[in-house]
Amino acid sequence: MPSKFSCRQLREAGQCFESFLVVRGLDMETDRERLRTIYNRDFKISFGTPAPGFSSMLYGMKIANLAYVTKTRVRFFRLDRWADVRFPEKRRMKLGSDISKHHKSLLAKIFYDRAEYLHGKHGVDVEVQGPHEARDGQLLIRLDLNRKEVLTLRLRNGGTQSVTLTHLFPLCRTPQFAFYNEDQELPCPLGPGECYELHVHCKTSFVGYFPATVLWELLGPGESGSEGAGTFYIARFLAAVAHSPLAAQLKPMTPFKRTRITGNPVVTNRIEEGERPDRAKGYDLELSMALGTYYPPPRLRQLLPMLLQGTSIFTAPKEIAEIKAQLETALKWRNYEVKLRLLLHLEELQMEHDIRHYDLESVPMTWDPVDQNPRLLTLEVPGVTESRPSVLRGDHLFALLSSETHQEDPITYKGFVHKVELDRVKLSFSMSLLSRFVDGLTFKVNFTFNRQPLRVQHRALELTGRWLLWPMLFPVAPRDVPLLPSDVKLKLYDRSLESNPEQLQAMRHIVTGTTRPAPYIIFGPPGTGKTVTLVEAIKQVVKHLPKAHILACAPSNSGADLLCQRLRVHLPSSIYRLLAPSRDIRMVPEDIKPCCNWDAKKGEYVFPAKKKLQEYRVLITTLITAGRLVSAQFPIDHFTHIFIDEAGHCMEPESLVAIAGLMEVKETGDPGGQLVLAGDPRQLGPVLRSPLTQKHGLGYSLLERLLTYNSLYKKGPDGYDPQFITKLLRNYRSHPTILDIPNQLYYEGELQACADVVDRERFCRWAGLPRQGFPIIFHGVMGKDEREGNSPSFFNPEEAATVTSYLKLLLAPSSKKGKARLSPRSVGVISPYRKQVEKIRYCITKLDRELRGLDDIKDLKVGSVEEFQGQERSVILISTVRSSQSFVQLDLDFNLGFLKNPKRFNVAVTRAKALLIIVGNPLLLGHDPDWKVFLEFCKENGGYTGCPFPAKLDLQQGQNLLQGLSKLSPSTSGPHSHDYLPQEREGEGGLSLQVEPEWRNEL
């Protein structure tokens, strides 16, 4: 069958492969079968366009006399090795020559006025000759793979007086550029009409975006010291771009335009309310304790802009200084309620601001088309299925008729949510609006968020003081009054735990209760079975302490559901899962419906009376729903044990909701007063929006605060004190190689790889591995950060295309029936940026024909690091996104993406069981210490592929230069993007801008 590739295409593919071997250090390899393996498993992914078969490529090289080929050996004739675009050293300029001596003062001079350096001075300017596009002050050079392009930058003196070129700085950290200057020495006088030429050669074997900057330093006309003399600079910003076909389809749809939020929603003096949803008829749970509103003080709202300015406590006005003093004082019992309440108020003010991102202008509503309810209107809300924004039954929003928004005092219509179906929300409005409504009438819509979680946290802070819980929150010593003998024999329900000494130790201390009133902590690193340990401990308490009653909680519905699923196996009649009425019953796992408060016959939630709920040995709720038990005023001594799973993932006031008012400190040997926290302080904590609350401690969970600051939980010479804390050490998830770096960085090398050998080594012989037996791939991509429309979140087309290529290899059908070799359910894709998540989903479900044709492709989860916490997959792919250097400092300031956020890095890389693939820019990531260790680990063990690995460079000097160059390079925002940082900081946290976290709906 004739090849579909021409001889020229076969030859070019072979030359590109030969260059690829040079970059990888494999140019001496001659074994034909080994070369075939490298070509098929590794080279084709980074080729960017469809590549010919290995044998066809060899044929093309052979007939072109570029290779010697036998049945067992292949020898490529020596070529001009373009992987590094090499030139004769006598002509080639050193990149950034003399920059180490001058770069600090040089970069400082042009920090604020980059645009000025694009224009000629004293008649001197730069002429460009060669293929390029000029865009926003940047010279864009489009490359075909393995094909050289040459650009000549001609510095011409078009003035009437002589000038002197004193220095020339080609600033570039990538080998795709080479600069040479025809042996013209510097300094070089340039008389009127004279030129100085710099030749720029560009070539790449890899798709990507490769930036460079050229800076000319000149001495102006006139004698030194005379009028007109002086140093001036001219700059040109270059970018070589080689796109894969898929990446070309992912370019920004519309230019990025930053939106401004105009303030609070328009709520006028005239408000008309719709009808609230009917309360469940089976709501028998008492409401004995009132719940306050706890609105932020108006004065705090007024002072917030000044607080965000970061004024020193010593120079700030008195009110600001007092608030800052409260924020900067360490958390103690004496300031516990005051400081945490202030932080909650600040977080709420940020939420009020962030929710405005979702407001809609001139959107139509229609009559409810499905239920034929004449009193409900339907509104399309993009993103509501992903809780962006969160809209639940019982919530409300405000709507103004578009035609009335400019009136002096229009009517604001308050609509209550009755039903949510995919991206459609069904709302009840007042009869006066319904009487004049016609399909297609347009509105301005302002969203709100549910304040219930904040209100119950404020109440919990009040109750903490009322019930004097300081011995539990700031423990100093145990009462040492055991409930059972320390040698009590535990017959485990899960017999597999008997071989794990750490899990046995934790369960024994929890059951005997020797730690009270101090909480007992199960420190569970990734994959060590903390939830399994906690569940078995609950079962043992039920078994050995007949009078015990347990409240088991988690911050999320999924976490609470998991507790219920595992407890019901052995305690089916003793447990009850209490769900919030806003929970979509379709999202509730089928196996827990028999033991939860859903009445299938009535088709609604029920809430049994307090007396009925007290009959169950174990109640399971989210932390926020536990507030309903406080409102019902359960007896303070009813719950003897409170277990909180995922305790490191919630704010401290959120943990208090399940404690304050439901548990008291026990002074005697009576059962009770035992709090158990399970989590990992090295993984992600609570998701916060306000930069102030992040800075001043609201991001600390109760678990992390105790581990960090309380002496009872400190690690001593002999390890942790098992009376208070157990660190689980056996990892049952990951291949030892995947576990290696996070184990060394975050867990003192103590974790032991105990995963099933067959499961963890499933991909050790996968053809796509750069090195067999090493199931980690770091695929280097020099991509480009992009943004589009009014979304501030970043995406990287080249990385998205590379991830898609790997998915095609992993999910390729293994038979003609179309059955995937690997189930999409076993694969997860992680990216820290919301827009990149959207682009990768678009590739999978729309652009790529092979992937979108898989029946179960919808089961492949693509999400943020936060969305994957607590989960695992056989294969994890990570797209780090950040590549253009112009936004590095934004990441450093706000802990965005992976840079400078060890917890996010730790969670991302520890989700994988058998194969971890990371796609990112090694040059950028190498400036973070943790990523640098990981990159070198991959390189040393043969797991690195993609663009050439950067040479080792001094970390601090490299970072200084990188950040300095970021101020020179044009960004996607245009030539004045250095103005972007202070503007975008104003009033909002970087996390909510870039990552766009889900709005909490765990009620």
Curated annotation (Swiss-Prot):
Gene3D superfamilies: P-loop containing nucleotide triphosphate hydrolases. The modification Phosphoserine is found at residues 432, 969, 977. Its main location: cytoplasm. Induction: By herpes simplex 1/HHV-1 virus infection. It is found in: Cytoplasm, P-body; Cytoplasm, Cytoplasmic ribonucleoprotein granule; Cytoplasm, Stress granule; Nucleus. GO terms for biological process: 3'-UTR-mediated mRNA destabilization; defense response to virus; miRNA-mediated gene silencing by mRNA destabilization; miRNA-mediated post-transcriptional gene silencing; positive regulation of mRNA catabolic process; regulation of neuron projection arborization; regulatory ncRNA-mediated post-transcriptional gene silencing; transposable element silencing. Its EC number is 3.6.4.13. Changing residue 129 to A: About 70% more antiviral activity against encephalomyocarditis virus replication. It catalyses: ATP + H2O = ADP + phosphate + H(+). Interacts with DICER1, AGO2, TARBP2, EIF6 and RPL7A (60S ribosome subunit); they form a large RNA-induced silencing complex (RISC). Interacts with APOBEC3G in an RNA-dependent manner. Interacts with TRIM71 (via NHL repeats) in an RNA-dependent manner. Interacts with both protein products of LIRE1, ORF1p and ORF2p. Interacts with TUT4 and, to a lesser extent, TUT7; the interactions are RNA-dependent. Interacts with AGO2, TNRC6B and UPF1; the interactions are direct and RNA-dependent. 5' to 3' RNA helicase that is involved in a number of cellular roles ranging from mRNA metabolism and translation, modulation of viral infectivity, inhibition of retrotransposition, or regulation of synaptic transmission. Plays an important role in innate antiviral immunity by promoting type I interferon production. Mechanistically, specifically uses IKKepsilon/IKBKE as the mediator kinase for IRF3 activation. Blocks HIV-1 virus replication at a post-entry step. (Microbial infection) Required for RNA-directed transcription and replication of the human hepatitis delta virus (HDV). Interacts with small capped HDV RNAs derived from genomic hairpin structures that mark the initiation sites of RNA-dependent HDV RNA transcription. This is Helicase MOV-10. It comes from Homo sapiens.
